[in-house]
Amino acid sequence: MYVPEHFAMKDEDAIVKIIQSYPLGVLVTQTESGLDANHIPFELDRERSVLAAHVARANPVWEQCQQGAEVLVIFRGSESYISPNWYPTKHETHRLVPTWNYEVVHVHGRLTVQDHDKFVRGVVARLTRVHEAGEPRPWKMGDSAPAFIDGMLKAIVGIEVVITRIEAKAKLSQNRELRDRQSAAEMLHKRGQADMANAMQAFEKTIARGDKQ
């Protein structure tokens, strides 16, 4: 991925936050017929540097890839169109053009298949706990009949991606003046695009902390 230095995201906590906030990753694999991409919700095990997930047994991805095959998982964070009209300097110089701001994390690693009940049951339970946490009465696997759950688990296969390296990019108008960035963030808030607005404002706080050190 092309990452200019001023757009490089190096803060590990910020990278983890994107993966956890936008867990639907794109698993890119190389097959005999070419590149393949599958959209899968992942769980990050930060201590082990591993991504865990499951796929349908009918999905050929787990059979097409050899154990330890090199793969790429892409996580897209907040993103938004940015109009030059939002920048005060545009109205002074008329030398700005539209752009697109975004956050993205590329996780490189090696794929291993975990086709056994303990792994599959564990990853399903953990993903469920995380994503049901905001519900008034969170659903849990024990809410369904054991035989039904057993049948569902047999229809999926577990996978892990052992992380080898991570590239992360946050294009948040860092190449613009402070007043331009602040104005763009305000316009995004007005348009209900809080995720990108908050990301840009969080970047400003990071700069402020750095200036005080």
What are the residue ranges of the model-derived segments?
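Binding-site signature for planar aromatic cofactors or substrates
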Residues: 1-213
